[in-house]
Amino acid sequence: GLSRTVTAGIISHVQRDTPTGSPFQRFIQTDAAINRGNSGGPLVNLAGEVIGVNSQIATSTGDYNGIGFALPSRDASQVYEQLRTTGKVRRGYLGVFLDSVKAEYAKVYGMRDERGAIVTHVRDADGPAAAAGLKAGDVIVEFDGKPVASAQDLISKVSSTGPDRSVVVAYLRDSGTAIERKNVTMRLGERPPNRTSRDGDRPTKLPVDPPAQEQKPFGLTLTAITPEMATSLNIDRTAGLVVKEISPESLIADVKLSSGVDAIGEGDIIQRINRKPVADPAAFGEIVRALKKGDAVVMHVLTPVSGTQTQLKIVQFTVQ
């Protein structure tokens, strides 16, 4: 590239998640040109202070397309110091999968604003979260005395906190009759290398035998949990309803999780909708029919991720 070149632009977003970024990296978005040869160079503010390291561009051709991303200098400095002093990067670890609270979840659960990280799966039976008693469905709202804005924010806070450190975590739990706020002190573990995110898990579709119901609330064809499925996944047959088919023209077919993947898939098990358990298709249909345009919807959904395991998903959307 051309040496001694300076480009200028505006910052339009901070803490931006990108498809190619790691779970620990949130980028500064700018329209200052980043081309081949100056990636890795500094992003500076008007005072000449380095605020980021140019890292990525959004492009379909390989050339600059008007949007670039820089790693915040604070993150780069933390990694540098660890490499300089210890020769490796160590990150704190909770041992959970997370999703972010959206407006629909906050409305259904009576939260003042859409802040917090929902625990969708406790990953390790002997990990820090499991030892502290956290469960799927808990919402972490504070970490080490600091409010948690989202799943990504919590990941950043945990990863930048050293392993073996004890921290106080505040979380909300639905007891069935009330939302209770709890505090727990936990000792962080060290994140193992090469751990993939939940999006790497591919759902295992199990056979659905009973005849499906004719009604299609939200465009979903639902059926009861089979005895074989209940035994295989170690769940009760009344634990929810199995999604047998999704109408491609339905609203829910376009609903995405925070990670960008489809919210509902065939073989998923819907457990609750707006805090109400659903043991049969008629009950589900009655709840859906009572909803009106603009109402918030939150569903607790289990996804089979192997022959014997499931993982919780929090599906959040608004009735259109």
Predicted regions and their residues:
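Active-site loop architecture of trypsin-fold serine endopeptidases
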Residues: 1-10, 15-40, 46-87, 91, ...
